[in-house]
Amino acid sequence: MAIFKVNGQSVQPEKNQKLLRFLRDELHLTSVKDGCSEGACGACTVIIDGKTCKACVPDTDSLDGREIITVEGLTEWEQQVYTYAYGKAGAVQCGFCIPGMVMCTKALLDENMEPTDDEIRYALRNNYCRCTGYVKIMDAVRLAAKILKAGEIPDDGDPNWTLGNRVARIDVEEKVLGYGKYPDDFYLDGMLYGVALRSKYARARVLSIDTSRAKALPGVEAVVTAEDIPGENKIGHLKHDQYTLIPVGSLVHYLGDAIALVAAKDRETAEKAIKLIKVEYEALPHVHTIEEAAAPDAPKVFDEEENNICAHKHISRGNAEEAIRNSKYVISHHFETPWTEHAFLEPECAVAFYDEDGDVFIYSTDQSAHQTLHECSLLLGTDKVKVQNALVGGGFGGKEDMTVQHLAALLTYVTKKPVKVKFTRAESLLVHPKRHPFYMDMTMGCDEDGNIMGVKASVTSDTGAFASLGGPVLERACTHAAGPYHYENFEIEGTAYYTNNPPAGAFRGFGVTQTCFATETLLNMMADKVGITPWEIRYRNAIRPGEVLPNGQIVDDSTGLVETLEAVKEDYDAAMAAGKPVGIGCAMKNAGVGVGIPDTGRVKLIVEDDEKLHIYSGASCIGQGLGTVLVQMIVTNTDIRQEDIVYERSNTWISPDSGTTSGSRQTLVTGEACRRACEKLDRKSTRLNSSHEWISRMPSSA
């Protein structure tokens, strides 16, 4: 076996394996993140003999005599520089990609202290970041180069932690240096690894399941099927329509449906066992398009439903048909948007175990710990369940639905041992809900000056194999389809269909993105037909405070569309005059639950034995920086110093439920709850001596 050095220490793996697995599973160097294991994402980047390399690519046997450096092997000075640079530049969000980016930065700056922008881009070319768009990461590289060349970190003085000031995030160090723990970074004594057997068909009936050969495989601790579930088998974000494990005699709805689970001593053994499970199916006709799903004789995705319609929405104001008929200009067009993958860098992972209270404890990476608690408790048939968010490597809506948490909990319940369930990137792509594909037919009428007279639209969406959030997504798509414009006549009819495709659910924009694309494109077409610029047609129709949107909402003073358009006009006109036209588009989106539903945020402030104020909230921090905002909120509204405040990650036994982290709502509603809790604290006290919980209930608007 090969002998090589890792961070200056000689090591000799006992077996040939991927370097990534050796670094993580045996040396527990968890700064080396596993984002894909396919040589694609760059989250596992290390330095080998001065050059960057993705650790998931080389086998350990190929590394004899080589020298490997991970973030853990950086000098103390280098760690300080990169923490400062990435924090100061605002380059860290979910943080999952950052250790890999740091290693790319080090390899570049070790050779070139004055890199050009092109050289920085080239150095980072193999590393993905889903959150930032790379601009801030490039800023961090430039700043790190400047500091390394100067030989000292700038003295910025004490930062001002009140709202409105720029500060480094409270979690920047643990994310830059890679010691902050995502669920996959937990290695517990005696931990097993869980893997699911998934359906061979998109639609079929399971006739029998034979697990005998899998159970006999050495290293297998348990093989679990539907009959082993102690509580409710079905889960679902709003509607419980998805089997955790498909029972014999029931239908599978898509290729991601799980049939059985295996818990084994390692993932390799679990994967071998999965292949030994024999499932007999009756393959059935399936539907993969809306046309197929809507056909009168279409196979039903759910036997118990009358048809394949998941949700229907109709909104009408004024008389759109008459307004369009009387318009000077009329344009009709068909638009389509595709399925879209969230592409968060951290694949779904959960670790479950029995804690000292005899509760099933789950470390999860999701957008609502309390939602996970609810569904796992129903599955296990017990309220002795706890959930805590570890670090979350991005969500964007894709981690609102259950994926791995309940599987880890079930295997722990059965085996009484710690269990880790982690998706491969291929599983993640298959299983978790995607952005809905939309098919839209839209007609717009305008007068001779380009003023919108009326819009009529018909939209359909493919919500896949389960309801997930298909109904609310359709509702947002329809209520926002009119755009941020002022006109009286609007009608839209929307239908979401079940198919045997992977489910579709929440994704940033939540349905608004799709119809906004259609409306804005149609508006550009109309501007061309009327003979005015895309800027001008938007300005003439822009909604102003006090006016009524086509969906019936009265706009308040917070709307600044006119001012925004005016602010860009000079640059827009200059680009057009220079023959370098730029695109322009307008959009509106609810902050919070939306459609008039009251929204709730909760915060609990507790002075612990360390005499520091601890912030507890059930709101998940998925990279958006909620913890930093809440700390700033307290500093702004009290005399408590930042160093006397501790932000606790969301859990379900102390942190009050603050709803799902979605809809850009947490700073608004949970932040307001935090502000109100601050009012209960003694602003003038030098010693913290109280604890308060406050609930913020706020009306939501589109």
Predicted regions and their residues:
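Helix-loop-helix junctions that connect adjacent transmembrane helices in secondary transporters/permeases
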Residues: D297-L378, A542-K612
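Short, surface-exposed loop/turn segments at secondary-structure boundaries that line and modulate
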Residues: N127-T132, K136, V224-D257, E292-A293, ...
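Intrinsic disorder at enzyme termini
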Residues: L124-P183, L565-E570, A574-A578, K604-L613, ...
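Single conserved hydrophobic/aromatic residue that forms the stacking wall/gate
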Residues: L688-A702
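Glycine-rich loop/linker segments at domain edges
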Residues: G90, N165, D171-L177, L238, ...
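Flexible, low-hydrophobicity surface segments
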Residues: A145-C310, V330, V414
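Signature of N-terminal electron-transfer/Fe-S-associated modules in redox systems
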Residues: M1-D156, V595
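Alpha-helical support elements that line or immediately flank enzyme active sites
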Residues: M101, D110, A196-A226, L261-E280, ...
